[in-house]
Every structure is written in C-alpha cells, then in structure tokens.
Amino acid sequence: MESNRVLLVVDGVRMNNAIYRKGHLQNSITVSPTQLERTEIVFGPSSVIYGSDALGGVIHYYTKKPKTAEEETIKSGFLSRFGTVNQEVTTSISTELSFKKWASYSSISYSSFGDLQMGKKRSHGFLDWGLVPNYSKNVGTNYYANQTINSDPTIQRNTGYNQTDVLQKFYLPLSKKTDLNVNLQYSSSSNIPRFDKLSELKSGMLKFAEWYYGPQKRFLAATQLSINPEKKWLEKGTFTIAYQNIKESRVQRKFGSLEKLFRNEEVDVYSVNGDFTVPLTKDKNRDLSYGFEVAYNDVTSVSEGKIINVINNNVVGYSGDFKVQSRFPDGGSSYLSTAVYVDYRQDLNKKSTLNTGIRLTDTRLEAKWVDQTFLTLPQDQINIKNSALTLTFGYVYKPTKNWQINSVISSGFRSPNLDDVGKVREK
C-alpha cells in the first residue's frame, strides 16, 4: 500500500489531509532528516490508535526536542554534505538553549539537488533502456519551441530542485507534573519538475514543454500540554492543539502551444488530540489508555490559464487569461473527522504481553462545484458521512532479551477523502 493508505505523523500530528492522493507523494521530504531525532514505523493496520489512512501502517517522525538544564547551556551544531551523484549540497545549522525554567531548539536546513544520473554499466543487455535522448529547455523564463538533444542521455534533465526547512521548538516545565511544548515547522521548495510527464511522447516527440509542481509549502504550529497527575484515574496524558497550512500547485504547457495552465490548492487543517493512560494495578502490569481526536480540513482549489508573451526566446509576461478546470471542486471543500478510542494492555508474565483496543470514528465530507464550463454534473454538491468501529487484538512474546515475536489481528478502515471523490484530471 502507498500514499493515502499509509499514515504520516510528525510529533503526534497527522500529516495526511483531505487531498492526499493514491499515487506517489513527496510530502515526506517536508520533514528534513537533519532535524529528526528518530522515526518509528508501525506495520499493518493501526486504525485503533491512529484512525483512518493507517491501513498499510504508520510512519511517525519525531523531531529533535530541547531539554532544560540546571546551568545555562548553549549548544550549536553545523552539518554540511555534498553528493557527487546528483551534485547535492545540504547545509544545516542548529542551536539549543537550555535553562532551568525553559529551553529552545532552533534549526534551519537548506538542500540543493541537481539532475539525477543513471549508471553507465548496462549489464542487463538493454543498451537504450532508460536513456533520455531529448529534453525540454523551457525552464524559468527560457522559451524553446522544440525539444533539445541531450548531450548525455544518462542524465535525467529537469529533475533537480532545492528546499528550505525551519524548525523552532520551546519547552517550558510549568510545574513538576505539567510541561508545555511549542512546535513550529516550515518547509518550502523550489519548483519540482515532473520527470515522467516531461518524458511523455506524442507522435515520437516530447509532449510537454513544461510540467512542474510549484513550490510545495508546509507550515505547522502545534502546542502540546503534558500532564502527570499520577492519580488512580489518570497517571499521565497529553493535549495537542495544531494548525497546518499546506500549499501545492501544478503548472503545465505543451510544445506548440503558448497556453500555460495553473492549478493551485491550499489546505488548512485544525486538529485537537487527547491521549491518556490509567494504571489499573500498583505494579503497572495492566493499564488502560483512552483518547479522542478531532480534525477539520478546509480545502481551496483554484485554476487559471494564461498566454505567455515571448520575445527573442524569453518569456516576458502573460496575457489573455482563460478558464481551466480546477483539480478539486472550486466552490470549496471540507473534511471533518472525530474519533474516540480505548486501549487495554496487560503483562501476562515477564515474557508475554496482551494488547486489545477499540475505536469509533465518524467522518464527514462536503464539496461544491460552481463553474460547470467543463463538467456538467447531475449534482453540484457532494455530502458523504461515514462511521467505522475498528478492533485490534495483539500478543507479544519475548523468548530472550534479543528476540521479540509480535502477532496481531486487527480491522482497519479508510474513509474516502476529497482526492477519492472530487478530483478531476491528472494525479
């Protein structure tokens, strides 16, 4: 399974949103590896704890966290990396401030990737397989009416891009049993060419002069309150409030045409999570976990077409706006998910652990088309309501310190999102 059948999570906040598609995604690159503390992978259906989209498993990214110290401490880090295979240059700078009552972690990372190059040893015997004989030089303001011969067919032209990632975290211990974490993340890329489309042929010639994803931008602001009352009814718990803003766009133009098509999407995601643990025995060999999640997605999809103005092989501007079919309903869309869950764990003995849980999820999707120039629909609105009750039963056996055997029986589900029911045209 891939894409919207696998759930991506960063610091306890789900990254999957209403427009995650079933094709290949590049959203994971918006979390810089230089800012990661660890990554956890959960295989198989995990819908009881994580909800919809966790059919194929969960990938949970944990970014680096600041820590307090009895004495004032300042730590700085610098990383620089260069790769010859695609002329990669990555630079990362970080600073951690540790004080008695608060701490901060700041990091900025920049990466630049050149065109990919394939190996020249072709032991499989297909001498021409994968080679790129021609490519489009229509990059930036350059205009070329025809395709260009590739001087080195082993280089996949128009595959390079760059991106910047910023991470800012604050940690404030409000009391011995209460902590506050503030998490700010921002990621932005350059235009990202779509190589498969730029290699597509029509009558033996390249079809597209331009086809690229516009700058992919992700902003996250999250606040997490951790409590440790150590009571019989509640040992510990966390409240997480988060806001995300995601911007994507697709731009394309065919050879032999001056018409350039722009499609832009923006998603605002508001979410609230609560996760709590209750010990059922003094030795804590049995505990009960429970929680809730509310997530609301607001989607805006707009599109337009423009005629490029060309002078001496340079694009000097645009004129003659025309209508283009939007990727998603142009009247706006929303996706609401609410859920509650209960999970029970018991250590049967020193080597065996039993785990079982149940989750109830309700999802609601609404969308509306306004402009029906290209589409004539029997209904101009979509209203979908789904609910699901999922169960899980797991058993863990540890025969030795170095071995662990896991078994699980679980039901999973995935509620259709806007990409499933409201997308028009290409992926």
Where are these regions (language model features)?
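Extracytoplasmic beta-strand/coil segments of soluble accessory domains associated
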Residues: 1-14
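N-terminal periplasmic accessory domains that precede
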Residues: 8-9, 25-29, 41, 54-77, ...
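Short acidic/polar hinge/loop motifs at secondary-structure boundaries
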Residues: 14-45
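Extracytoplasmic loops and strand-loop junctions of Gram-negative outer membrane beta-barrel proteins
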Residues: 41-42, 74-77, 125, 148-154, ...
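Transmembrane beta-barrel wall of Gram-negative outer-membrane proteins
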Residues: 86-112, 123-190, 217-219, 282-283, ...
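Flexible, surface-exposed loop regions and adjacent strand-edge segments
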Residues: 121-130, 136, 187, 196-207, ...
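Face-selective signature of the C-terminal outer-membrane beta-barrel domain
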Residues: 173-187, 215-372, 387-388, 392-404, ...
